[in-house]
């Protein structure tokens, strides 16, 4: 099981990393060809997809489907799975019809709310209509994708994701070279997503057929159990979504497409890094579900402890480097257009930095409703802090006040979120505080030195950027390995090597 987890994690890292790079490459192409306003309009329409703002309303269909299939691989009751997936499928279709109808009928009102100018109204409305139609496929696809994740077939998911992203980027570059209208970019993106969803559907049917699972009428007990999980996930997604994917929509309400384009460009790199780490841990959900089904509490605890200490060890240095070197990154990536806002791009990295301590706990405790409810409550506190800070600074910083609110809210609530996970994992307080404290000190001191160094060295190429950031990360990793990790943590590395056949077993 652990070997499969490592294998799936590597697949997710490589495939989504490549797809993320392609996605970042295409943003300056869109902005330079069609403008920030047009880019903002494209972003607004993507918010209405399950991968965007609408994710807060998806009832956790993908996560619940993953848990259902993963648990079935332990208890082997595939008839029960058939009933459960039947209910989730019907629920997803009803949700898709409701979402699509709301988008189609609400298109005229959305153009007014987003302050779309007369020159773009008709084309923007057409994109909204096609987005509504695409959701009829993309919302049920959440169940299909969750099913494939439950079988831990991450190679298929990531390959299809990379292929669809590559097709989108290539066709967008082509549209740029032939001076096509900006709405073509939106249509290319929708087509790529729908084709990928159909490929995942084929994989879902194949996997379920192999196990002999058949769709069947569900029982009242099945319906109540699944609805309870869905509503609990909905609560967390609603709260988390307001401080995440809904923010570009809020920027559009106050500042129009230009504000959306500016906001999205400033937070895109930090958001991609956050999603990338989320995908690294997405392979954990089926494993955690199977461990919970088995009652393997010791392994479950060990998994959570490694996530709280070792994941930040690897992921925080690149994020800190991205924050400190934001002026250089923004200049090379977008150009001089948004260079004056580099400070805000750096501030946006605070959000994924805070998330690193929570991401694995948030995933594995999807199987523990009590802990999840506590985390949801803390998210609501974070939301209140975000709203207060953003409202107080909206007149000073425009759309950038949303970034400030997120950063402050994340920092204020983080200690309580970490403590909730520590208590749930029964970790000893003193040793845990020591590990996190030393880790924070290393990163603060290292980031300060990097900031001074960046003011003296001209970082004006990707090679120089990679060398400076890479050196910083390497020094940070070595320092944390020596000063933060205990012997039992370090033992994980040779164990993984043995498991993957990369190191000989000791006698």
Named regions from a protein language model:
Residues 1-5, 182, 186, 200-245, ...:
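Interhelical loop/hinge segments that connect adjacent transmembrane helices in multipass membrane
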Residues 30-53, 84, 182-187, 222-233, ...:
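Interfacial/gating helices of multi-pass transporter permease domains
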Residues 15, 19-23, 27, 46-51, ...:
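Short runs within selected transmembrane alpha-helices of multi-pass transporters and secretion channels
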Residues 4-19, 58-112, 126-132, 297-318, ...:
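Membrane-water interface segments that mark the loop-to-transmembrane alpha-helix transition
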Residues 58-75, 150, 208-213, 266, ...:
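Helix-loop junctions and terminal segments of transmembrane helices
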Residues 1-24, 32, 62, 79-87, ...:
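N-terminal membrane topogenesis motif
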Residues 107-131, 313, 322-354, 425:
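Interfacial segments at transmembrane-helix termini and the short loops linking adjacent helices
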Residues 423, 427-429, 451-507:
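Membrane-proximal transmembrane or re-entrant/amphipathic helices at the cytosolic face
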């Amino acid at each position: 099981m652990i070997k499969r987890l490592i294998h799936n994690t590597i697949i997710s890292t490589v495939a989504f990393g490549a797809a993320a790079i392609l996605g970042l490459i295409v943003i300056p192409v869109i902005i330079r060809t069609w403008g920030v306003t047009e880019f903002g309009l494209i972003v607004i329409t993507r918010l209405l997809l399950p991968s965007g703002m609408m994710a807060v309303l998806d009832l956790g269909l993908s996560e619940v489907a993953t848990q259902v299939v993963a648990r079935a691989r332990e208890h082997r009751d595939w008839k029960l799975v058939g009933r459960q997936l039947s209910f989730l499928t019907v629920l997803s279709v009803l949700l898709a019809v409701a979402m699509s109808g709301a988008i189609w009928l609400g298109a005229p009102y959305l153009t007014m709310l987003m302050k779309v100018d007369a020159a773009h109204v008709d084309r923007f409305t057409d994109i909204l209509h096609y987005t509504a139609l695409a959701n009829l496929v993309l919302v049920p696809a959440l169940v299909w994708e969750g099913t494939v994740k439950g079988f831990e077939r991450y190679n298929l998911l990531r390959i299809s994701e990379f292929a669809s992203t590559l097709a989108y980027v290539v066709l967008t570059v082509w549209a740029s070279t032939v001076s096509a209208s900006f709405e073509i970019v939106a249509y290319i993106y929708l087509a790529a997503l729908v084709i990928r969803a159909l490929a995942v559907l084929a994989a879902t049917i194949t996997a379920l057929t192999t196990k002999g699972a058949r769709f069947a009428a569900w029982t009242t007990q099945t319906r109540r159990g699944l609805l309870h999980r869905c509503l609990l996930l909905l609560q967390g997604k609603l709260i988390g979504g307001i401080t995440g994917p809904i923010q570009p929509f809020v920027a559009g309400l106050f500042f129009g497409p230009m504000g959306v384009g500016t906001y999205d460009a400033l937070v895109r790199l930090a958001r991609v890094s956050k999603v990338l780490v989320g995908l690294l841990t997405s392979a954990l959900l089926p494993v955690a579900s199977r461990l919970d089904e088995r009652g393997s509490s010791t392994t479950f605890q060990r998994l959570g402890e490694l996530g709280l200490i070792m994941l930040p060890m690897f992921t925080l240095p690149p994020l800190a480097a991205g924050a400190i070197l934001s002026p250089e990154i923004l200049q090379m990536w977008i150009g001089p257009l948004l260079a004056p806002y580099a400070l805000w791009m750096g501030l946006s990295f605070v959000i994924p930095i805070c998330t690193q301590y929570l991401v694995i706990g948030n995933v594995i405790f999807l199987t523990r409703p009590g802990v999840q409810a506590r985390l949801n409550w803390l998210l609501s506190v974070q939301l209140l802090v975000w709203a207060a800070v953003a409202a107080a600074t909206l007149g000073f910083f425009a759309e950038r006040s949303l970034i400030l609110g997120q950063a402050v809210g994340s920092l204020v609530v983080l200690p309580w979120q970490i403590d909730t996970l520590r208590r749930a994992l029964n970790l000893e307080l003193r040793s845990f505080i020591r590990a996190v404290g030393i880790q924070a000190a290393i990163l603060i001191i290292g980031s300060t030195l990097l900031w001074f160094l960046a003011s003296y060295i001209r970082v004006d190429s990707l090679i120089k950027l990679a060398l400076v950031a890479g050196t910083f990360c390497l020094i940070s990793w070595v320092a944390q390995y020596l000063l933060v990790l205990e012997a039992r943590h370090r033992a994980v590395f040779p164990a993984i090597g043995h498991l993957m056949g990369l190191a000989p077993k000791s006698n």
